[in-house]
Amino acid sequence: MAKNVLIRPLAREQYDKFMARGRVLFFSAPCGFGKSILAETLLAGQQVLSLTAGEPDFALPADDKDWQVLLIDDLRQMTEEPDQQALCQLIREYAGRRFVLLSRGAVPGWLMAFQYAGLMAVLDTNALLWDREDIRTLFHRQGTPVGESVITEILRETSGYPLGVAVIAHCMVGGRPYSPELVAQCYHEVFFYFETAVYRRFDLPIRRFLLELAPFESFDVELARMVSGDPRAGERLGWLQQNTTMLRPAGVNQFRFWAQFRTFLLWEMDREYSDEKRRTVLNRGGLYYELKEDYSHALECYTMGGDHSKVSELLVRNAELHPGMGHYSEMEKYYRSLPEQEIAASPALMQGMSMLCALAADYEGSERWYQALSQ
């Protein structure tokens, strides 16, 4: 296993600076980024005291005897203020010692003073994601070199997520070729790992909250509150920001899920939610966007939610607000998603379909809708 540990140049550079003149090295990334094994590999040969926060026997050392580096895994589980203060005191008091802290969460507020003072370096997902050279090196080490086109496909599928790449590499040991079937198998292996290592560890309200936000590429507190019906939506988003690294900023007061985690959540939603329940969530999102007069996103939600009457209503309203050929081109996919009987019930929609058919050089279809409109 150790031979497959890749130390990226940026991680090595940060580690060397930390050992030379830093005090704290903080790893902040979701599960599957190899934080623990990377830290252990970097610290090989050092006198390390390893602890895991949240364990029943967890206790900080009383002094600096018998260790040069204090390694604490799962730091987000250190929730008691006396422990937090004690760790800060150790960092301040023992300037000659080093502290390596691993967490699936963000840097907690009680440690930020060390970051602002230049005493703490942070290795986040950007520093730990693998690139083409890393992927090439991994496959070469295990004796299954791959071509550039396969590396491109692996990078596209995994976005450089270390666990995803490692699972694909493992499945290709023995000469199995890269294929869509292999990728599907690897996705399922990673998803089952996520389910056990991450998802099932959340409380039920958080799990439900995550699933109901999964269909939306980005969201704010208001959308989260509307689609989940949870009055504590803002509090839950704050908890997720602090205790996980699954949320990414997507603008002012806007969030999105880390891409691989969102894909997992959609997979989990398909398993746990009925079609009716999934449509309900999407249509709530459609209502949110409709109230914001963001008709493009509202139409997308209502279409996926199968609410044809709302799609019809918004297409008519949008055509009134934006008359002209551009409207029809932009909204074509929503017109074509409607059943013919829904279109035939609205003169405005029949006119729109006639125009769309003409734009597509489907003159027979255009004439058919024009004749239906005239009757």
Spans of features found by a protein language model:
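P-loop NTPase Walker A phosphate-binding motif
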Residues: S28-V48
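Conserved catalytic segments around the Walker B and adjacent sensor/switch elements
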Residues: A44-F58
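Alpha-helical sensor/transducer elements of the RecA-like P-loop NTPase core
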Residues: A11, I37, Q85-E153, E157, ...
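C-terminal boundary/linker of central alpha/beta nucleotide-binding cores
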Residues: S149, F192-D270
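Conserved P-loop NTPase "ATPase switch" module shared by AAA+ and STAND
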Residues: A62-D83
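Amphipathic alpha-helical "lid/sensor" segments that cap RecA-like P-loop NTPase cores
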Residues: G32, L38-A39, A121-V122, H140-F192, ...
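N-terminal pre-P-loop "Q-motif" helix
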Residues: A2-Y15
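Extended alpha-helical scaffolding segments used for macromolecular assembly and cargo binding
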Residues: D275-A360, E364-A372
